[in-house]
Curated annotation (Swiss-Prot):
It comes from the Bacteria. A motif (Histidine triad motif) lies at residues 95-99. Residues 3-110 form the HIT domain. It comes from Chlamydia pneumoniae (Chlamydophila pneumoniae). PROSITE patterns: HIT_1, HIT_2. One of its GO terms (molecular function) is catalytic activity. Signal peptide: none annotated. This is HIT-like protein CPn_0488/CP_0266/CPj0488/CpB0508.
């Protein structure tokens, strides 16, 4: 069971900022920016690459949540959205999650 599944199940404390039927959003415990949130689907999908085609609509819902949280946290004018896919992509927890980072200039990714 991943740490995110344990958070979703209420077994591990977190600083929750959003929850609905399909997603939970929490503050990252090791933030890389003044605002660093994780948007996590409740369904245990290991990687972005593993989302079934007929469930890709979840990503549209996640995008709307990102927009709402960016506005709520005052970063709507500039933020970064990141999904690490697989070990080679830097994914450390194999439960799909989206990083929302902002609150300072983040610079370009070359």
């Amino acid at each position: 069971m991943t740490v995110f599944k344990q958070i979703i199940d209420g077994l591990i404390d977190c600083e929750k900022v959003f929850e609905n039927e399909n997603f939970i959003a929490i503050k990252d415990r090791f933030p890389q920016a003044p605002v660093h949130l994780l948007i996590i689907p409740k369904k245990p999908i290991p990687r972005f690459q593993d989302i079934p085609g007929d469930e890709m609509i979840l990503m549209a819902e996640a995008g709307k949540i990102v927009q709402e949280l960016a506005a709520e946290f005052g970063i709507a004018d500039g933020y970064r959205v990141v999904i690490n896919n697989g070990a080679e992509g830097g994914q450390a927890v194999f439960h799909l999650h989206i990083h929302l980072l902002g609150g300072r200039p983040l610079g370009a990714i070359a």
